[in-house]
Amino acid sequence: MSMSSSNITSGFIDIATFDEIEKYMYGGPTATAYFVREIRKSTWFTQVPVPLSRNTGNAAFGQEWSVSISRAGDYLLQTWLRVNIPQVTLNPLLAATFSLRWTRNLMHNLIREATITFNDLVAARFDNYHLDFWSAFTVPASKRTGYDNMIGNVSSLINPVAPGGNLGSTGGTNLNLPLPFFFSRDTGVALPTAALPYNEMQINFNFRDWTELLVLQNSALVAPASPYVPIVVPTHLTVAPVLGPVQVWANYAIVSNEERRRMGCAIRDILIEQVQTAPRQNYTPLTNASPTFDIRFSHAIKALFFSVRNKTSASEWSNYATSSPVVTGATVNFEPTGSFDPIANTTLIYENTNRLGAMGSDYFSLINPFYHAPTIPSFIGYHLYSYSLHFYDLDPMGSTNYGKLTNVSVVPQASPAAVNAASGAGGFPGSDYPQSYEFVIVAVNNNIVRISGGETPQNYLSGSFVTLLNRRKWSREGPMIMVQ
């Protein structure tokens, strides 16, 4: 058996190959020495997670409620929603053909809308569609399983149970949803809460009702009939589900007295991200396979997300495929055989010009995210068009001001599978009864938050306010809004 060998002297041969191209790549007064590390110091700080106090409303299914953002901390870094999902039991007296499960992406779809407000004026918002898109294109594979566990994609919740079976655990199941507001993207854009003493800051939630989140099916209803059944209490459930404890947690940074004194001394502009969702529109491949949808966004758009949602079951919010999920015993297949992307190709038009002409869905689902997103979605039907070289980067790397464009429209050409499934002729379970669809498009845009305080450290709290630039629909005077 031979012995492996090497010696230090041979390395000098490599060093001796230094020539003209190496002069271009190596050396000089600004060259980095990789073997003498320079410490990059930071200011002194600590982090503290705290629950936020309830402000208005009742945190329950189908309700609107809010929490107040505390100013006890200096910078708000991240927030997340923690919910206890109750155990649900399907009525044991029902026929064995019935099954019950929670919708996929439960924590996403619990949120009809979430907003952050300054003195009741909305600074940022998102909905369940943005949560679906954002997680699909930004959560890396190394965190995907953990994220699925946090938002409810676990077998005890999304796998169907027969009559007498229980969804969830005794005492409920605790789920967590990271809230993707602009300040959570990076510590450099954290919200300086200590510099905003005269702003009433709130996070507001609009929750869906439990009837919109539970999926009841009856396999005795065979094609062409839909297997989905509206839930009735006490016929299907003996009691209506009630949420357990609901909390919003915030992670704050506490800084030194010196840094705190400087926070409000000068005007500070923060480049933030906002979300716009166009009104959903019916998508009917049988009658119009190439519909044209007007999209009216504004500001510097850095990315467009779009999909055709399968709404055959009103409670299946995160299905963007041609087929409905298929239940077999105690399992569910969310992408059954014969399930495809409802969109074959897409045309983007503005200024009477084809910005993108009949680009195949593989471009929006694979190629564009491969180059411009942190990850490629693992499920069918998610589409991205990024104006930015890397839309997840906070720095400006490309955008288009939709406020300056006219007659913007998108034409999603239906795939043959969508046409067949719409008529119930898909040929496989899940598409052998008529499927219905709607078109969803979401934009991420940049905007600027201006935070301004007093002129001196002694009175920096006296004049703090937040200004949102270029938000014309919120304007009080001209192109800006001021939150005093």
From Swiss-Prot:
Q: What is this protein called?
A: Major capsid protein
Q: Which family does the record assign?
A: Belongs to the NCLDV major capsid protein family.
The record's listing under Pfam families reads: Capsid_N (PF16903), Capsid_NCLDV (PF04451)
Function (record text): Major capsid protein that self assembles to form an icosahedral capsid. Represents around 50% of the total virion protein mass.
Quaternary structure annotation from Swiss-Prot or TrEMBL? Homotrimer.
Q: Which GO terms describe its cellular component?
A: viral capsid
Coiled coil where?
Answer: none
What are the protein's UniProt keywords?
Answer: Capsid protein, Late protein, Virion
UniProt organism field: Wiseana iridescent virus
Specify the domain of life of the species encoding this protein: Viruses
Chief site of localization:
virion
Q: What is the lineage of its organism?
A: Viruses, Varidnaviria, Bamfordvirae, Nucleocytoviricota, Megaviricetes
Ligase recorded as keyword: no
